Regions:
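Short acidic, glycine/serine/threonine-rich loops at helix termini
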Residues: 15-19, 66, 103-105, 134-139, ...
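Cap/lid and interdomain-hinge subdomains that line or gate substrate/regulatory clefts
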Residues: 51-56, 62, 95, 99-101, ...
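Low-complexity, highly charged intrinsically disordered N-terminal segments
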Residues: 43, 47-82
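Extended hydrophobic packing segments that form well-structured cores
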Residues: 76, 259, 374-491
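Hard-cation-handling environments
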Residues: 3, 190-401, 406-407
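Glycine-rich phosphate/diphosphate-binding loops that line cofactor/substrate pockets in enzymes
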Residues: 1-2, 54, 80-91, 275-288
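Active-site histidine-anchored catalytic micro-motif
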Residues: 4, 9-11, 68-75, 83-174, ...
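N-terminal amphipathic/basic leader segments beginning at the initiator methionine
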Residues: 1-48
Length: 491
Protein backbone atom coordinates (compact mmCIF):
# COMPACT_ATOMS: atom_id res chain seq x y z
CA UNK A 1 0.00 0.00 0.00
CA UNK A 2 1.33 3.44 -1.00
CA UNK A 3 0.25 6.56 0.87
CA UNK A 4 1.36 9.98 -0.33
CA UNK A 5 2.70 12.53 2.13
CA UNK A 6 2.44 16.32 1.71
CA UNK A 7 3.59 18.76 4.40
CA UNK A 8 2.44 22.37 3.97
CA UNK A 9 2.74 24.06 7.36
CA UNK A 10 2.18 27.80 7.39
CA UNK A 11 0.76 29.69 10.34
CA UNK A 12 -1.09 32.79 9.13
CA UNK A 13 -1.06 35.71 11.52
CA UNK A 14 -3.76 38.13 10.34
CA UNK A 15 -2.14 40.97 12.28
CA UNK A 16 1.02 40.76 10.16
CA UNK A 17 1.34 43.63 7.71
CA UNK A 18 2.79 41.68 4.82
CA UNK A 19 1.24 38.80 2.91
CA UNK A 20 3.39 35.80 2.12
CA UNK A 21 3.91 33.53 -0.85
CA UNK A 22 4.50 29.79 -0.75
CA UNK A 23 6.69 27.89 -3.18
CA UNK A 24 6.17 24.18 -3.73
CA UNK A 25 9.11 21.98 -4.74
CA UNK A 26 8.64 18.35 -5.84
CA UNK A 27 10.42 15.74 -3.78
CA UNK A 28 13.67 14.63 -5.50
CA UNK A 29 12.88 11.35 -7.20
CA UNK A 30 16.41 10.05 -6.63
CA UNK A 31 16.28 10.79 -2.90
CA UNK A 32 13.24 8.93 -1.66
CA UNK A 33 14.84 8.22 1.72
CA UNK A 34 15.75 11.83 2.45
CA UNK A 35 15.29 12.58 6.14
CA UNK A 36 12.33 14.81 6.95
CA UNK A 37 13.60 15.05 10.50
CA UNK A 38 14.50 12.80 13.39
CA UNK A 39 11.12 13.30 15.04
CA UNK A 40 9.07 12.31 12.02
CA UNK A 41 8.55 9.00 10.24
CA UNK A 42 10.91 8.81 7.29
CA UNK A 43 8.91 8.87 4.04
CA UNK A 44 10.12 6.21 1.66
CA UNK A 45 10.31 3.72 4.54
CA UNK A 46 7.82 0.87 4.75
CA UNK A 47 6.21 -0.17 8.02
CA UNK A 48 3.36 -2.63 8.45
CA UNK A 49 3.41 -3.10 4.69
CA UNK A 50 2.69 0.60 4.13
CA UNK A 51 4.98 2.86 2.14
CA UNK A 52 4.80 6.56 3.00
CA UNK A 53 5.71 8.39 -0.21
CA UNK A 54 6.91 12.01 0.03
CA UNK A 55 5.57 14.14 -2.81
CA UNK A 56 6.87 17.64 -2.07
CA UNK A 57 9.62 19.18 0.02
CA UNK A 58 8.18 20.26 3.38
CA UNK A 59 6.95 23.84 3.67
CA UNK A 60 7.39 25.29 7.17
CA UNK A 61 6.78 28.99 7.72
CA UNK A 62 4.78 31.61 9.59
CA UNK A 63 3.72 35.15 8.76
CA UNK A 64 0.85 36.92 7.10
CA UNK A 65 -1.91 35.29 5.04
CA UNK A 66 -0.89 33.80 1.70
CA UNK A 67 -1.27 35.78 -1.51
CA UNK A 68 -4.13 34.32 -3.62
CA UNK A 69 -2.06 34.03 -6.81
CA UNK A 70 0.70 32.22 -4.97
CA UNK A 71 -1.75 29.77 -3.42
CA UNK A 72 -3.50 29.15 -6.74
CA UNK A 73 -0.15 28.26 -8.28
CA UNK A 74 0.60 25.96 -5.35
CA UNK A 75 -2.69 24.10 -5.84
CA UNK A 76 -2.07 23.66 -9.55
CA UNK A 77 1.44 22.35 -8.94
CA UNK A 78 0.27 19.93 -6.26
CA UNK A 79 -2.46 18.51 -8.50
CA UNK A 80 0.10 18.04 -11.27
CA UNK A 81 2.45 16.21 -8.90
CA UNK A 82 -0.35 13.90 -7.79
CA UNK A 83 -1.37 13.22 -11.38
CA UNK A 84 2.16 12.08 -12.13
CA UNK A 85 2.06 9.39 -9.45
CA UNK A 86 1.60 5.86 -10.76
CA UNK A 87 -0.65 4.75 -7.94
CA UNK A 88 -1.57 6.10 -4.54
CA UNK A 89 -3.99 4.40 -2.21
CA UNK A 90 -4.33 7.41 0.08
CA UNK A 91 -2.88 10.79 1.00
CA UNK A 92 -1.76 12.43 4.23
CA UNK A 93 -1.73 16.20 4.51
CA UNK A 94 0.35 17.70 7.30
CA UNK A 95 -0.95 21.23 7.95
CA UNK A 96 -1.11 23.85 10.68
CA UNK A 97 -4.86 24.33 10.46
CA UNK A 98 -4.28 28.09 10.40
CA UNK A 99 -3.23 28.72 6.80
CA UNK A 100 -5.25 31.61 5.38
CA UNK A 101 -5.64 32.87 1.83
CA UNK A 102 -6.96 36.35 2.48
CA UNK A 103 -9.76 35.50 4.95
CA UNK A 104 -10.35 31.94 3.65
CA UNK A 105 -9.06 28.68 5.11
CA UNK A 106 -6.21 27.46 2.93
CA UNK A 107 -6.64 23.91 4.22
CA UNK A 108 -10.29 23.92 3.16
CA UNK A 109 -9.43 25.29 -0.29
CA UNK A 110 -6.69 22.69 -0.67
CA UNK A 111 -8.91 19.81 0.41
CA UNK A 112 -11.75 20.89 -1.87
CA UNK A 113 -9.42 20.95 -4.87
CA UNK A 114 -8.08 17.50 -4.09
CA UNK A 115 -11.52 15.98 -3.54
CA UNK A 116 -12.80 17.49 -6.79
CA UNK A 117 -9.84 16.19 -8.80
CA UNK A 118 -9.34 12.87 -7.01
CA UNK A 119 -12.78 11.91 -5.62
CA UNK A 120 -11.80 8.33 -4.75
CA UNK A 121 -8.61 9.27 -2.89
CA UNK A 122 -9.00 9.00 0.89
CA UNK A 123 -7.23 11.77 2.81
CA UNK A 124 -6.05 11.95 6.41
CA UNK A 125 -4.96 15.20 8.06
CA UNK A 126 -2.25 15.71 10.67
CA UNK A 127 -2.83 19.19 12.09
CA UNK A 128 -0.79 21.44 14.35
CA UNK A 129 -1.70 22.10 18.00
CA UNK A 130 -2.91 25.59 16.98
CA UNK A 131 -5.38 24.31 14.36
CA UNK A 132 -8.77 25.97 14.11
CA UNK A 133 -10.20 24.28 11.04
CA UNK A 134 -13.61 25.16 9.55
CA UNK A 135 -16.30 22.54 10.10
CA UNK A 136 -16.53 22.04 6.32
CA UNK A 137 -13.11 20.34 6.42
CA UNK A 138 -14.57 17.45 8.40
CA UNK A 139 -17.28 17.03 5.79
CA UNK A 140 -14.55 16.27 3.26
CA UNK A 141 -12.52 13.98 5.52
CA UNK A 142 -13.34 12.90 9.07
CA UNK A 143 -9.84 11.56 9.71
CA UNK A 144 -8.22 14.56 11.42
CA UNK A 145 -5.89 14.38 14.39
CA UNK A 146 -3.07 16.30 16.05
CA UNK A 147 -0.60 16.09 18.93
CA UNK A 148 -1.40 15.28 22.53
CA UNK A 149 1.49 17.41 23.75
CA UNK A 150 1.93 21.19 23.47
CA UNK A 151 4.45 21.83 21.93
CA UNK A 152 3.97 18.80 19.66
CA UNK A 153 6.93 16.65 20.66
CA UNK A 154 4.82 13.56 19.87
CA UNK A 155 4.44 14.47 16.21
CA UNK A 156 6.09 11.28 14.92
CA UNK A 157 3.91 9.03 17.06
CA UNK A 158 0.74 10.81 15.97
CA UNK A 159 1.76 10.58 12.33
CA UNK A 160 2.34 6.84 12.77
CA UNK A 161 -1.16 6.51 14.21
CA UNK A 162 -2.64 8.47 11.31
CA UNK A 163 -0.87 6.30 8.73
CA UNK A 164 -2.24 3.14 10.30
CA UNK A 165 -5.76 4.54 10.62
CA UNK A 166 -5.76 5.70 7.01
CA UNK A 167 -4.59 2.26 5.91
CA UNK A 168 -7.43 0.62 7.84
CA UNK A 169 -9.88 3.07 6.28
CA UNK A 170 -8.56 2.26 2.80
CA UNK A 171 -9.03 -1.44 3.53
CA UNK A 172 -12.57 -0.65 4.76
CA UNK A 173 -11.81 -2.05 8.20
CA UNK A 174 -13.10 1.14 9.86
CA UNK A 175 -15.55 3.93 9.06
CA UNK A 176 -14.22 7.15 10.64
CA UNK A 177 -16.72 9.68 11.97
CA UNK A 178 -15.59 13.00 13.46
CA UNK A 179 -17.26 14.84 16.35
CA UNK A 180 -16.33 18.47 17.09
CA UNK A 181 -16.85 20.58 20.17
CA UNK A 182 -15.66 24.20 20.19
CA UNK A 183 -15.16 26.72 22.95
CA UNK A 184 -14.33 30.35 22.22
CA UNK A 185 -11.23 30.28 24.38
CA UNK A 186 -8.39 32.37 23.01
CA UNK A 187 -5.25 30.68 24.28
CA UNK A 188 -2.05 32.59 23.43
CA UNK A 189 0.79 30.40 22.23
CA UNK A 190 2.77 31.18 25.39
CA UNK A 191 0.25 29.34 27.60
CA UNK A 192 -0.18 26.34 25.32
CA UNK A 193 1.92 24.12 27.55
CA UNK A 194 1.34 20.54 28.66
CA UNK A 195 4.45 20.53 30.86
CA UNK A 196 2.68 22.38 33.68
CA UNK A 197 -0.83 22.75 35.15
CA UNK A 198 -3.56 22.83 34.13
CA UNK A 199 -2.91 21.31 30.71
CA UNK A 200 -0.40 18.72 31.95
CA UNK A 201 -3.42 16.50 32.55
CA UNK A 202 -4.25 16.37 28.84
CA UNK A 203 -1.68 13.92 27.38
CA UNK A 204 -2.41 11.05 29.80
CA UNK A 205 -6.14 11.77 29.71
CA UNK A 206 -6.34 11.77 25.91
CA UNK A 207 -4.27 8.59 25.74
CA UNK A 208 -6.68 6.94 28.17
CA UNK A 209 -9.71 7.98 26.11
CA UNK A 210 -8.11 6.46 23.01
CA UNK A 211 -8.01 3.09 24.77
CA UNK A 212 -11.72 2.75 23.96
CA UNK A 213 -11.76 0.41 20.92
CA UNK A 214 -14.52 2.49 19.29
CA UNK A 215 -12.48 5.70 19.55
CA UNK A 216 -9.79 6.03 16.90
CA UNK A 217 -8.21 9.37 17.82
CA UNK A 218 -8.75 12.29 20.19
CA UNK A 219 -7.18 15.73 19.92
CA UNK A 220 -7.53 19.00 21.77
CA UNK A 221 -6.54 21.82 19.42
CA UNK A 222 -5.62 24.93 21.40
CA UNK A 223 -6.29 27.37 18.57
CA UNK A 224 -4.42 30.41 17.31
CA UNK A 225 -5.60 33.80 18.63
CA UNK A 226 -3.30 35.57 16.17
CA UNK A 227 -5.68 34.66 13.34
CA UNK A 228 -8.81 36.79 13.55
CA UNK A 229 -11.31 34.28 12.12
CA UNK A 230 -14.74 33.01 13.11
CA UNK A 231 -13.30 29.58 14.01
CA UNK A 232 -10.84 31.05 16.53
CA UNK A 233 -10.69 29.16 19.79
CA UNK A 234 -10.19 25.73 21.28
CA UNK A 235 -11.57 22.68 19.45
CA UNK A 236 -11.89 19.09 20.59
CA UNK A 237 -11.99 16.51 17.80
CA UNK A 238 -12.95 12.91 18.52
CA UNK A 239 -12.76 10.43 15.65
CA UNK A 240 -14.70 7.23 16.21
CA UNK A 241 -15.35 4.07 14.27
CA UNK A 242 -18.95 4.74 13.23
CA UNK A 243 -19.88 5.75 16.80
CA UNK A 244 -21.14 9.29 16.31
CA UNK A 245 -22.95 9.66 19.64
CA UNK A 246 -19.98 8.32 21.59
CA UNK A 247 -17.77 10.85 19.83
CA UNK A 248 -20.10 13.74 20.59
CA UNK A 249 -20.27 12.82 24.27
CA UNK A 250 -16.50 12.44 24.61
CA UNK A 251 -15.83 15.70 22.76
CA UNK A 252 -18.28 17.62 24.93
CA UNK A 253 -16.83 16.23 28.16
CA UNK A 254 -13.26 17.07 27.15
CA UNK A 255 -14.22 20.55 26.00
CA UNK A 256 -15.94 21.18 29.32
CA UNK A 257 -12.86 19.98 31.18
CA UNK A 258 -10.58 22.40 29.31
CA UNK A 259 -13.08 25.24 29.71
CA UNK A 260 -13.44 24.64 33.45
CA UNK A 261 -9.65 24.79 33.91
CA UNK A 262 -9.29 28.26 32.39
CA UNK A 263 -8.94 30.11 35.69
CA UNK A 264 -6.02 27.86 36.69
CA UNK A 265 -3.87 29.00 33.76
CA UNK A 266 -0.68 30.80 34.78
CA UNK A 267 -0.22 33.69 32.37
CA UNK A 268 3.23 35.21 31.75
CA UNK A 269 3.54 38.49 33.66
CA UNK A 270 7.23 39.42 33.59
CA UNK A 271 8.35 42.30 31.41
CA UNK A 272 11.51 41.72 29.41
CA UNK A 273 13.43 44.03 31.78
CA UNK A 274 12.20 42.10 34.81
CA UNK A 275 13.10 38.77 33.22
CA UNK A 276 16.64 39.84 32.32
CA UNK A 277 17.20 41.44 35.73
CA UNK A 278 15.95 38.29 37.47
CA UNK A 279 18.30 36.14 35.39
CA UNK A 280 21.24 38.46 36.13
CA UNK A 281 20.59 38.18 39.86
CA UNK A 282 20.31 34.38 39.82
CA UNK A 283 23.54 32.57 40.74
CA UNK A 284 22.40 29.07 39.76
CA UNK A 285 24.49 27.13 37.27
CA UNK A 286 23.34 26.67 33.72
CA UNK A 287 21.95 29.31 31.36
CA UNK A 288 18.75 31.18 32.04
CA UNK A 289 16.45 31.02 29.03
CA UNK A 290 14.23 34.04 28.37
CA UNK A 291 11.50 33.87 25.74
CA UNK A 292 10.61 37.05 23.86
CA UNK A 293 6.97 36.03 23.37
CA UNK A 294 5.65 39.10 21.55
CA UNK A 295 8.09 38.78 18.65
CA UNK A 296 7.95 34.99 18.34
CA UNK A 297 8.54 34.07 14.71
CA UNK A 298 6.82 30.71 15.26
CA UNK A 299 3.58 32.71 15.57
CA UNK A 300 4.16 34.85 12.50
CA UNK A 301 5.91 37.82 14.13
CA UNK A 302 8.64 39.44 12.01
CA UNK A 303 11.51 38.77 14.42
CA UNK A 304 12.80 42.34 14.14
CA UNK A 305 11.60 43.48 17.56
CA UNK A 306 14.04 45.43 19.72
CA UNK A 307 12.50 45.26 23.20
CA UNK A 308 14.86 42.49 24.34
CA UNK A 309 17.84 44.11 22.64
CA UNK A 310 17.24 47.44 24.35
CA UNK A 311 16.65 45.86 27.77
CA UNK A 312 19.79 43.71 27.65
CA UNK A 313 21.97 46.65 26.59
CA UNK A 314 20.41 49.03 29.09
CA UNK A 315 20.87 46.62 32.00
CA UNK A 316 24.47 45.86 31.05
CA UNK A 317 23.89 42.13 30.61
CA UNK A 318 27.01 39.99 30.18
CA UNK A 319 27.55 36.49 28.86
CA UNK A 320 24.22 36.97 27.12
CA UNK A 321 23.02 35.75 23.73
CA UNK A 322 20.05 37.14 21.78
CA UNK A 323 18.77 35.08 18.87
CA UNK A 324 17.77 36.71 16.71
CA UNK A 325 17.12 40.08 15.10
CA UNK A 326 15.82 39.92 11.53
CA UNK A 327 17.32 42.86 9.67
CA UNK A 328 18.38 42.43 6.03
CA UNK A 329 19.51 46.07 5.86
CA UNK A 330 21.87 45.50 8.77
CA UNK A 331 23.18 42.36 7.08
CA UNK A 332 24.10 44.40 4.01
CA UNK A 333 26.11 46.78 6.20
CA UNK A 334 27.79 43.87 7.98
CA UNK A 335 28.78 42.28 4.68
CA UNK A 336 30.43 45.51 3.59
CA UNK A 337 32.42 45.72 6.83
CA UNK A 338 33.56 42.10 7.05
CA UNK A 339 34.61 39.85 9.92
CA UNK A 340 36.62 41.32 12.78
CA UNK A 341 35.85 44.96 12.05
CA UNK A 342 34.24 47.52 14.38
CA UNK A 343 30.73 48.49 13.32
CA UNK A 344 28.09 51.07 14.20
CA UNK A 345 24.56 50.76 12.87
CA UNK A 346 20.87 50.88 13.73
CA UNK A 347 19.59 47.39 14.44
CA UNK A 348 16.04 46.02 14.15
CA UNK A 349 12.67 47.76 14.03
CA UNK A 350 12.85 48.65 10.35
CA UNK A 351 9.39 47.67 9.07
CA UNK A 352 6.94 47.25 11.98
CA UNK A 353 7.27 49.58 14.95
CA UNK A 354 4.73 47.61 16.96
CA UNK A 355 7.74 45.50 17.91
CA UNK A 356 10.04 48.42 18.68
CA UNK A 357 12.18 51.00 16.90
CA UNK A 358 15.72 50.72 15.48
CA UNK A 359 18.39 50.76 18.20
CA UNK A 360 21.79 52.43 17.57
CA UNK A 361 24.48 49.88 18.49
CA UNK A 362 28.25 49.63 18.37
CA UNK A 363 30.37 46.51 18.38
CA UNK A 364 32.42 43.95 16.46
CA UNK A 365 31.49 41.61 13.60
CA UNK A 366 32.52 38.22 14.95
CA UNK A 367 31.27 35.88 12.24
CA UNK A 368 29.30 35.90 8.97
CA UNK A 369 27.48 32.86 7.59
CA UNK A 370 25.08 31.76 4.87
CA UNK A 371 22.28 31.13 7.39
CA UNK A 372 21.59 27.54 6.32
CA UNK A 373 21.56 24.98 9.09
CA UNK A 374 19.83 21.87 10.40
CA UNK A 375 17.31 22.20 13.18
CA UNK A 376 18.04 20.23 16.31
CA UNK A 377 14.77 20.80 18.14
CA UNK A 378 12.81 17.57 18.68
CA UNK A 379 9.90 19.29 16.91
CA UNK A 380 11.65 18.81 13.56
CA UNK A 381 15.19 17.66 14.16
CA UNK A 382 17.27 17.59 10.99
CA UNK A 383 15.01 19.94 9.04
CA UNK A 384 17.01 22.29 6.81
CA UNK A 385 16.32 25.98 7.44
CA UNK A 386 17.53 29.03 5.56
CA UNK A 387 17.68 32.29 7.52
CA UNK A 388 19.47 34.08 4.69
CA UNK A 389 22.90 35.70 5.15
CA UNK A 390 23.44 35.92 8.90
CA UNK A 391 25.97 37.35 11.32
CA UNK A 392 27.18 37.20 14.90
CA UNK A 393 27.69 40.66 16.37
CA UNK A 394 29.25 41.39 19.74
CA UNK A 395 27.60 44.61 20.90
CA UNK A 396 28.64 46.99 23.67
CA UNK A 397 26.13 47.67 26.45
CA UNK A 398 26.01 49.91 29.50
CA UNK A 399 28.14 49.23 32.57
CA UNK A 400 30.77 47.51 30.36
CA UNK A 401 28.24 44.90 29.33
CA UNK A 402 28.57 42.88 26.14
CA UNK A 403 25.78 41.17 24.22
CA UNK A 404 26.13 38.54 21.49
CA UNK A 405 23.41 39.06 18.88
CA UNK A 406 22.49 36.82 15.97
CA UNK A 407 21.27 38.88 13.01
CA UNK A 408 19.54 37.17 10.09
CA UNK A 409 18.27 38.16 6.69
CA UNK A 410 14.89 36.48 7.03
CA UNK A 411 12.73 34.99 9.80
CA UNK A 412 12.86 31.32 10.67
CA UNK A 413 11.74 29.60 13.89
CA UNK A 414 14.05 31.08 16.52
CA UNK A 415 12.95 28.52 19.11
CA UNK A 416 16.36 26.85 19.36
CA UNK A 417 20.08 27.56 19.09
CA UNK A 418 20.84 25.99 15.72
CA UNK A 419 21.61 29.25 13.93
CA UNK A 420 23.78 30.51 16.78
CA UNK A 421 25.79 27.31 16.75
CA UNK A 422 26.13 27.44 12.96
CA UNK A 423 27.73 30.87 13.40
CA UNK A 424 30.26 29.43 15.83
CA UNK A 425 28.82 30.75 19.10
CA UNK A 426 29.65 28.58 22.11
CA UNK A 427 26.18 28.61 23.65
CA UNK A 428 27.36 26.59 26.66
CA UNK A 429 29.31 29.63 27.91
CA UNK A 430 26.25 31.90 28.08
CA UNK A 431 24.53 32.73 31.36
CA UNK A 432 21.49 34.26 29.68
CA UNK A 433 19.94 33.16 26.38
CA UNK A 434 17.09 35.16 24.85
CA UNK A 435 15.08 33.53 22.06
CA UNK A 436 12.30 34.96 19.87
CA UNK A 437 9.92 32.18 20.86
CA UNK A 438 6.63 31.95 22.73
CA UNK A 439 6.54 28.30 23.73
CA UNK A 440 8.22 25.99 21.21
CA UNK A 441 11.65 26.43 22.80
CA UNK A 442 10.27 24.29 25.61
CA UNK A 443 10.37 21.32 23.24
CA UNK A 444 14.15 21.06 23.55
CA UNK A 445 14.96 22.70 26.86
CA UNK A 446 12.89 20.10 28.74
CA UNK A 447 14.73 17.24 27.03
CA UNK A 448 17.92 15.67 28.36
CA UNK A 449 18.75 13.46 25.42
CA UNK A 450 20.24 13.75 22.82
CA UNK A 451 21.09 17.33 23.74
CA UNK A 452 24.07 18.13 25.93
CA UNK A 453 23.18 19.09 29.51
CA UNK A 454 25.48 22.11 29.12
CA UNK A 455 22.82 23.97 27.13
CA UNK A 456 19.81 22.92 29.17
CA UNK A 457 18.51 25.99 30.99
CA UNK A 458 18.44 26.30 34.74
CA UNK A 459 15.16 28.19 34.39
CA UNK A 460 12.82 29.39 31.66
CA UNK A 461 11.23 32.84 31.86
CA UNK A 462 8.50 33.86 29.44
CA UNK A 463 8.58 37.63 29.02
CA UNK A 464 5.59 39.67 27.85
CA UNK A 465 6.85 41.89 25.04
CA UNK A 466 5.06 44.02 22.45
CA UNK A 467 4.26 42.45 19.11
CA UNK A 468 1.80 40.40 17.12
CA UNK A 469 2.55 37.23 19.11
CA UNK A 470 2.13 38.74 22.57
CA UNK A 471 0.09 36.85 25.19
CA UNK A 472 -1.51 40.20 26.08
CA UNK A 473 -4.62 39.88 23.89
CA UNK A 474 -5.67 43.46 24.69
CA UNK A 475 -3.01 44.35 22.11
CA UNK A 476 -5.34 43.22 19.30
CA UNK A 477 -8.54 44.55 17.76
CA UNK A 478 -10.67 41.56 16.78
CA UNK A 479 -13.39 41.80 14.14
CA UNK A 480 -14.19 38.22 13.15
CA UNK A 481 -13.76 36.26 16.40
CA UNK A 482 -17.12 35.17 17.77
CA UNK A 483 -18.09 36.97 20.96
CA UNK A 484 -18.26 36.50 23.85
CA UNK A 485 -14.74 35.11 23.91
CA UNK A 486 -12.61 34.25 26.92
CA UNK A 487 -10.58 36.03 28.28
CA UNK A 488 -11.69 39.13 26.38
CA UNK A 489 -15.22 39.06 27.79
CA UNK A 490 -16.73 38.42 31.20
CA UNK A 491 -18.59 35.14 31.78
Amino acid sequence: MRIGFVSIRHRSNTFARQHRSLILSPWPQNNQRHDLGTNIILPGVEFDGIELVPLVMPVHSAGGPIEPDSFSTLLTELVTILEQQDSLDGLILEVTGTLLVEEHSGELLLLRRLVERFPSLLVGILADQVAQLPEAVFGLTPLVLGPHHWPGIDRAQRLALLVRLLARWIRREIRPVAALERRTMLLPLAIQRTDCPPFDQLPPLLAAVEQNPSILAVTVFAGFPYADVAEAGMTVVVVTDAAAELGKTAARQLADLVWDSREQIAWPTLTIEEAIHQAMQNDSTGPHLILDTGDATEAGAPGEGTAALWAALDLGARQTLLSAIVDPQAIEIVLRHGIGTPIELELGGKTDHRHGYPIPVRGIVRRIGCGQYRRWSPLAGGELLDAGPSAWLEIEGRYEGHLDVVVSGRPVPFDELGLARALGIDVATKRIIILKSAVEALAWCRQSDPFTPLVRPAQVLQAVTPGIATPDLAFFSYRSVKRPAWPLDTY
